[in-house]
Amino acid sequence: MNKITKYIDALPLSDAEKSALPDTSLQAVHQALDDEHQTFAREDDSPLGSVKARLAHSWPDSLSGDQLVKDDEGRTQLHAMPKARRSSMIPDPWRTNPVGRFWDRLRGRDVTPRYLSRLTQEERESEQKWRTVGTIRRYILLLLTLSQTVVATWYMKTILPYQGWALINPADMVGQNLWISFMQLLPYVLQSGILILFAVLFCWVSAGFWTALMGFLQLLIGRDKYSISASTVGDEPLNPAHRTALIMPICNEDVDRVFAGLRATWESVKATGNAAHFDVYILSDSYNPDICVAEQKAWMELIAEVQGEGQIFYRRRRRRVKRKSGNIDDFCRRWGSQYSYMVVLDADSVMTGECLSSLVRLMEANPNAGIIQSSPRASGMDTLYARCQQFATRVYGPLFTAGLHFWQLGESHYWGHNAIIRVKPFIEHCALAPLPGEGNFAGSILSHDFVEAALMRRAGWGVWIAYDLPGSYEELPPNLLDELKRDRRWCQGNLMNFRLFLVRGMHPVHRAVFLTGVMSYLSAPLWFMFLALSTALQVVHALTEPQYFLQPRQLFPVWPQWRPELAIALFASTMVLLFLPKLLSIILVWCKGPKEYGGFIRVTLSLLLEVLFSVLLAPVRMLFHTVFVVSAFLGWEVVWNSPQRDDDSTPWGEAFMRHGSQLLLGLVWAVGMAWLDLRFLFWLAPIVVSLILSPFVSAISSRATVGLRTKRWKLFLIPEEYSPPQVLKDTDAYLTLNRQRSLDDGFMHAVFNPSFNALATAMATARHRHGHILEIARERHVEQALNETPDKLNRDRRLVLLSDPVTMSRLHYRVWAAPEKYSSWVNAYQQLALNPLALKTK
């Protein structure tokens, strides 16, 4: 079989169609496939003429009549997106310096935004009512939190051993030996630091406690007059004039999982009968060429399988500006004006059609709602770590989400996905300018969701959490290290966002959101400092002689005090604040029926195991988050390159590499405290034991085998596992199907396989006009690539080739026309583990 016959055999044609093709030359084959009989100046451009035929035979059910067009140079182009109608989306520059803004105001240059109300008198009165209620509630929260903190801090002050602050007079220390002065002051300085840190941390814990408590009462009572979900009956027809875009920004994601979830979501939308009101946009920022080709293939298959022509679109950006927020902004500028609403989906998001329809109805019923955030439920993972986290978020999460809604009402959070957004005000007010200045906290905003919610509220639009709306799902990281990688990004983003704390016009609630966002990570180094100062105080107490006389003519000594009854009372109170939300959560499950969680005994046992698991992980997260915060402030780059692995498990080597320093710290800390005072080690045991066990907990909890075993025992069971909704069952089924036909090494297939080459050529984004300099550059790219072995062609160079239809055509032609000349490429392709189902395109 010669090379021409081999090529014809690789075409997606019937035997009769193959036999009708000439076998004299490769150029003749492409000319025979070209119904339009185009002529090309170069022989290796002839595959451009057969792109349409190869696509039509490969994916006949995926193409509509007007999708294949000719670009300005007469090359076949696959229109994967509708015609753009551009809108202006211009960000306002940030003024983060309050002194500069005050000076502008003095000079009459106040640019604080003011927005006209869009509401009727009745709607304004209704809105003012809930805003007033929300303000009163938040003042109550502030009063409760501060009162509790003041009482606890006073208790803490009486517990600390050194009570002689009032007797210390700096004037008496003048001329005194410096070492004596230092030793007199040291215990009190340490105690002051401990007291300040305790107050901050206790206030943080107290706010969480009251949030969970109010969420518990909301869910227990079951009636909420301010719930946005109560504003519709639930069966109103959707307004055909207000269409919704489901947008999914992705970047180098698991293609099989992305398209499985998207297919399940779309089929659920179709089942509601409302599919005509929705379009789907897959917005790719992927820069891995293999994944890019796999995405294109999966998109074509999705369209064929759900008959999604004209409603499911795909776009890969050539310039990845501002990451995810820039991806969404680009959609809004080009196609946003065609839609009233958009629902933002993550790569792992799955939503039911009823949930999506309900979100649209809520937008229709609440004309001043700018963002409505659903409450995603975690499901779909099998590792022990993920199942434990799924159980925790499913049991505890509703309390905190309902509590957030209770305090915030329509001035709430937006989490960046599984939420519906009103497009017009988003375009007008939510464009994000880079943060001014230089350094680690300048540049493009990373945690864009909190900032977009703040800007939407600043413009007068409401931001709501539909905490009681079912049908919204997501997935969690499979293991601790993957979660920490995500936390590294979120830490940087939240620290950057805090620069906006004093920006003009921000609502106090969203200033508080910025504060809580930064405290989510800043609490870790504060907690670590609290433990370090407590340890230092114990060292001082054990190794130095107390200073009984702090004044020259003091009559009575100041004895260090130890009041264990108060210490135990304060410890118990703190434990109540930390663990009562968990108890309230399980009480709620017991009241509403524990059957879906495995029954009364198993759900209770799962709760106890989860508490133990969280105690083991808390110190580990504390140290990692401390490193993240310190590195962000010092401008250090935290490089985290994990080895490739076939599943979600953490190898033992990586576990000890990541947690080895924590294990060593735990051992040194434990031995040192045991040597000083065994009684103090008892109080410190939860910390040091967790650090010593961290590599073992991290590795074992990442095993799916252990997680599946707990699933068989009905531990950490959640309702989505006990009785999976149809959309999740469909996601699993489609994921299995996609895994069977998964495409690996997509770039090599796009070079060699006629079908995938046609697809890559038709969807290539670099549609340049002919030019002499451009031709020289193209020829250089192709020649340099073919003169090297494929493994030496790096990702960026592959992406350049993949983005140009001409270079892909020439690569394809040359490796088939002269296989002996380019044997390194041919041999590399033949050695690939080919998946016959992935190549079965017809």
From Swiss-Prot:
Pathway of action: Glycan metabolism; osmoregulated periplasmic glucan (OPG) biosynthesis
Annotated keywords: Cell inner membrane, Cell membrane, Glycosyltransferase, Membrane, Transferase, Transmembrane, Transmembrane helix
Record has ATP-binding as a keyword: no
Family annotation (CDD domains): Glucan_BSP_MdoH
Gene Ontology cellular component list: plasma membrane
EC identifiers of the protein: 2.4.1.-
Keyword Transport carried by entry: no
Cell location: Cell inner membrane
Transmembrane segments: 140-160, 194-214, 513-533, 568-588, 600-620, 622-642, 656-676, 680-700
Signal peptide stretch: none
MF annotations from Gene Ontology: hexosyltransferase activity
Membrane topology: Multi-pass membrane protein
One example of a Gene Ontology biological process annotation: glucan biosynthetic process
Top EC class of this enzyme: transferase
Protein family according to the UniProt entry: Belongs to the glycosyltransferase 2 family. OpgH subfamily.
Function according to Swiss-Prot or TrEMBL: Involved in the biosynthesis of osmoregulated periplasmic glucans (OPGs).
Full protein name: Glucans biosynthesis glucosyltransferase H
Gene: mdoH
